[in-house]
Amino acid sequence: MKPTKQILEDILNEVRPLIGQGEVADYIPALACVPSNKLGIAVYTNDGEMITAGDANERFSIQSISKALSLTLAMELYQPEELWHRVGKEPSGQAFNSLIQLEMEQGVPRNPFINAGAIVVADMLFSRFSAPKHRLLEFVRKLSGNEHIIYDRVVANSEMDHSDRNASIAYLMRSFGNFENEVMPVLKNYFHACSLNMSCVDLAKTFGYLANKGIQPETNEFIITPMQSKQINALMATCGLYDGAGEFAYRVGMPGKSGVGGGIIAIVPGEMTIAVWSPELDPSGNSLAGTQALELLSERIGRSIF
């Protein structure tokens, strides 16, 4: 079955009672101010159809969803052996900001979707781009077709003001020789990436290339190779939802990437992208109502990679 607006609206009505059962990300003060009753979903098909319901056009801080976009840029710039020498491809089973595993594994992060891995990727982009912050924003605007996407400076500054743990992660990796640049400028770029302000509609369009073998559906532009698209989807399926990745694969059955702003992007390879947003999170840091909405949609339209 194809997704329809009615299906999306019905699903949002079914998951709305979950609002009030999760927690917004209060460790980033600027995110704690977001109204917890927001709920939106957008589906973007490979033939260019956009189907939405709820607050699908309202922008929010995408946070760790940006890690998949930064990884895409890094895969364009670096040979595989260079990239995967510095960051792994395995699930961590730990909290996304854990230091324990990083110490035990000699400063090489398990995957690019935990904080340590994304900070390594940010360091790699910093080494190759004279202005990585501007390059990422340009890339996202091109993919989404929306020139009005911006960084939320309030969120970025809030994260910078509470950066002790991420700075510790970066300095620990530096002590093992897995960091090339000064820590704080790299972290500033990393926090700006997390602060990208986008809607479900923006996200669904932006990630279209991962549902279309590396080609952006609307423009037919080559972004990455089919092999690279497969690899990013595989990492999203195994590592994209922190230590809740297995639960998400079991319930939803799609590659996905979440952020503590309450957004999740999910991919149905060869068919569509799905973006959901609900700010309240489960204990793993994933959107509570958003995950349930994706599970219901997977069941209703009969889509899963498994």
UniProtKB/Swiss-Prot annotation:
Superkingdom assignment: Bacteria
Binding site for substrate: 64, 115, 159, 166, 190, 242, 260
Alphabetized Gene3D superfamilies for the sequence: DD-peptidase/beta-lactamase superfamily
MF (Gene Ontology): glutaminase activity
Parts of the chain that traverse the membrane: none
BP term (GO), one: glutamate biosynthetic process
Entry keywords, A to Z: Hydrolase
Catalysed reaction, written as an equation: L-glutamine + H2O = L-glutamate + NH4(+)
Top-rank EC class of the record's enzyme: hydrolase
The enzyme's E.C. designation: 3.5.1.2
Family membership: Belongs to the glutaminase family.
Oligomer status and interactors: Homotetramer.
Descriptive protein name: Glutaminase
